[in-house]
C-alpha cells in the first residue's frame, strides 16, 4: 500500500465516526508466554503496583489497555461480543480544528467525552490541526499538498480560540484523556508541514499547561506507510517531526497493513513498513516512553468471508498480538471495528469489512485473546498510573 492510499478517518468539527513488502530477511515477533499474571516494573503507583516508564495513565507493568475505535454504530455491535468484565477501557474520536463542513461545537465535544465516561471508557481524542481531507486524486492535484494548518497554528493566532475551547472542555471534564495531536504526522495524506508540525504540537501542549490542565496525556503518533524520517534532524538540530520528550507523554503507532506488523524488515529502497515499525518502537524505548496503538484493523481482509477471516487471524491478528506480547513498551491498543466498504475514502482504495461482529468463529479467538490476564479492561482503569487523581 502506498502512502497515498492510507487515509485517516474523515475528520469533523466533531466526528463520532464517528506498504509494499520488499526483499530482506523475514522476521516476526515471538510471543512469550503471556497467560500468567503480569508483574515487574520500576516505579510504584496505586496499591503498590509498578510501572515500567512511570508515564501518565500508564498501566501496571505487564498489562495492556484494551481500547475501541471510532464508529458508534459498530462499537454497539462490538460490546456483546465480549463479556462484561472484558469491555474496552478507551474509545477513539476525531476532532478537526479547521473543518469547514460542520459547525464548531464545544458543547458537543463535552457531551461526547461525558458519554464515553459513562461507559467507563477513557477518551482517546485525535486533535487534527488541519481541515477536510482530500481524496488521493484531489491531493495529487493540489498546488500545495501540505494543506494542513499546523503551520498557521505554530506561527499565528487564527486558530487559538478553537484550541482554547478544547483546553476549556478538557479541563472541565476533569477525568483522564489521551490527546493525540496530529495523528499519523508524516503521512502525506494529512498534509502536515515538516518542522512546523512539532512547533504546533508544542504550542498546543503549552496552551493546556498554561491553563493548569493536568488530566491530559499527550500522544505523538506515526503510521508505518509513511517515510521513516520521524527521528530526522536538520543541521541546526531541529527535529523534522518530533516535538520533544518534554511535551510527549506517549509514543503511538497505527497498524492496518499486515506488512506493518511482521515480515521483511528491509526493502529495495531501505526499511520496509515493518522495519519502520521496529525503528519507531526502538525510538520510544530510547526515549523511555510507552506506546499506544491508536488505530488498528486488518484492512486487507474481509472478515465477513470465512476464508478471509481465517487468513486474517493467521496473517494479521496473530502477528499483531505477538508484536504486542514481544514489545513490552506497547501498553495500549485500539481496534477499529468497521466495514470500510461503507466509507467512500476507503472503499475506493480497496479496504474491506473489518467489523468483528460478522467474523463468525474468529470472534471466539479474539475473545480468548482478550481473556488473558495481561489485558486491562474498563473495570480496571483505576489501576492506571495517576488515574485516582482524576476520578
List each language-model region with its residue ranges.
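Substrate-binding cleft of extracellular glycoside hydrolase catalytic domains
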Residues: 99-222, 356, 366, 379-380, ...
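Bacterial signal peptide processing site
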Residues: 20-24
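Aromatic-lined carbohydrate-recognition surfaces of secreted/lumenal glycan-active proteins
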Residues: 209-235, 288-302, 332-338
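Aromatic- and acid-rich polysaccharide-binding/catalytic face
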Residues: 86-96, 238-269, 336
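Substrate-binding cleft of secreted/luminal carbohydrate-active enzymes
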Residues: 49-74, 177, 292-391
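Glycoside hydrolase catalytic-domain groove-lining segments
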Residues: 107, 111-128, 246, 256-303
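N-terminal substrate-binding region of glycoside hydrolase catalytic domains
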Residues: 45-159, 298-301, 309, 334-341, ...
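C-terminal motif of bacterial Sec signal peptides marking the signal peptidase cleavage site
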Residues: 15-18
Amino acid at each position: 500500500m502506498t502512502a497515498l492510499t492510507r487515509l485517516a478517518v474523515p475528520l469533523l468539527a466533531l466526528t463520532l465516526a464517528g506498504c509494499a513488502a520488499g526483499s530482506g530477511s523475514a522476521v516476526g515477533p515471538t510471543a512469550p508466554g503471556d497467560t500468567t499474571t503480569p508483574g515487574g516494573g520500576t516505579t510504584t503507583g496505586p496499591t503498590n503496583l509498578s510501572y515500567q516508564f512511570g508515564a501518565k495513565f500508564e498501566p501496571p507493568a505487564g498489562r495492556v489497555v484494551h481500547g475501541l475505535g471510532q464508529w458508534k454504530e459498530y462499537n454497539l455491535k462490538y460490546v456483546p461480543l465480549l463479556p462484561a468484565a472484558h469491555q474496552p477501557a478507551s474509545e477513539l474520536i476525531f476532532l478537526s480544528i479547521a473543518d469547514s463542513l460542520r459547525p464548531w461545537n464545544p458543547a458537543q465535544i463535552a457531551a461526547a467525552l461525558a458519554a464515553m465516561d459513562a461507559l467507563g471508557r477513557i477518551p482517546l481524542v485525535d486533535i487534527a490541526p488541519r481541515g477536510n481531507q482530500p481524496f488521493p486524486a484531489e491531493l495529487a492535484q493540489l498546488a500545495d499538498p501540505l494543506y494542513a494548518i499546523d503551520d498557521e497554528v505554530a506561527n499565528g493566532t487564527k486558530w487559538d480560540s478553537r484550541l482554547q475551547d478544547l483546553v476549556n472542555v478538557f479541563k472541565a471534564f476533569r477525568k483522564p484523556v489521551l490527546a493525540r495531536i496530529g495523528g499519523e504526522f508524516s503521512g502525506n495524506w494529512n498534509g502536515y508541514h515538516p518542522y512546523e508540525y512539532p512547533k504546533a504540537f508544542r504550542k498546543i501542549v503549552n496552551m493546556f499547561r498554561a491553563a493548569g490542565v493536568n488530566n491530559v496525556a499527550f500522544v505523538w503518533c506515526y503510521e508505518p506507510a509513511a517515510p521513516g524520517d520521524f527521528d530526522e534532524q536538520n543541521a541546526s538540530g531541529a527535529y523534522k517531526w518530533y516535538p520533544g520528550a518534554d511535551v510527549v507523554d506517549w509514543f503511538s503507532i497505527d497498524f492496518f497493513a499486515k506488512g506493518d506488523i511482521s515480515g521483511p524488515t528491509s526493502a529495495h529502497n531501505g526499511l520496509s513498513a515493518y522495519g519502520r515499525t521496529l525503528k519507531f518502537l526502538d525510538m520510544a524505548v530510547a526515549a523511555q516512553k510507552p506506546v499506544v496503538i491508536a488505530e488498528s484493523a486488518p484492512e486487507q481482509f474481509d472478515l465477513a468471508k470465512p476464508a478471509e477471516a481465517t487468513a486474517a487471524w493467521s496473517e494479521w491478528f496473530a502477528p499483531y498480538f505477538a508484536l504486542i506480547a514481544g514489545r513490552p513498551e506497547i501498553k495500549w491498543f485500539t481496534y477499529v471495528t468497521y466495514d470500510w466498504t461503507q466509507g467512500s475514502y476507503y472503499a475506493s482504495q480497496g479496504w474491506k469489512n473489518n467489523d468483528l461482529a460478522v467474523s463468525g468463529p474468529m470472534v471466539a479467538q479474539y475473545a480468548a485473546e482478550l481473556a488473558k490476564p495481561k489485558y486491562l479492561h474498563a473495570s480496571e482503569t483505576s489501576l492506571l498510573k495517576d488515574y485516582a487523581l482524576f476520578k
